[in-house]
């Protein structure tokens, strides 16, 4: 329950058909209860169950700090169907991140990852992510040892689905996500939190595309567009910074949730 008996906000439903539903997960919410976050009060599974009056089954996860599209099932059979698409890598996921520094226009990262809680001798698992630069920003403000603050907006297209894959791959590229307390740098995280008045991980699950669960031969595209102030007010604040867009359609793709060609 939320503190002092306050009601939780309604979770925005992005799509609902048959026994499948997709919602916008706000940053700071856990997908489900866990013993590692005993003091937390905001859980998507329990809140959505109470909101729509039926049990829900998550078929993938987003980190607590990540906002955006979260797909769930309303029955065990639908959960198995959706999970099979993820296992066969038929789900195309698209994320937006604000990172430290100015990365290359494109990057293909094929860097195996060992699970965070695995012993050192455990084998690393294959992990592949494509990155595309969307925009750059430079502010004449010294942070840490740098005379300027440079950040970029990147599109992340994960091919595999390892835990914390995008965050760890961006760290591998030496461009960690702003607000990432584990893989980023505290001085930059603190400066941006104070500058924007928002303390969060700047990672957003912008869209999912997958074979339509109810219509053979069709594809389903679900987006949580950054153009929606109701869903993504903090990102709208970020986008007021002086960004230099890397491609003609980069801003439109970011705002509307349009999917780039792979």
Describe the predicted segments one by one.
Residues 104-105, 135-141, 171, 213:
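Short, conserved beta-turn/loop elements at beta-strand boundaries and strand-helix junctions
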Residues 162-170:
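Short beta-strand segments enriched for Tyr within beta-sheet-rich domains
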Residues 76-122:
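N-terminal accessory regions of nucleic-acid-interacting proteins
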Residues 39-52, 114:
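Internal amphipathic helical hairpin motif
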Residues 24, 71, 97, 131, ...:
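Residue-level signal for inorganic ion chemistry
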Residues 116-149:
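Non-catalytic RNA-recognition surface used by pseudouridine synthases
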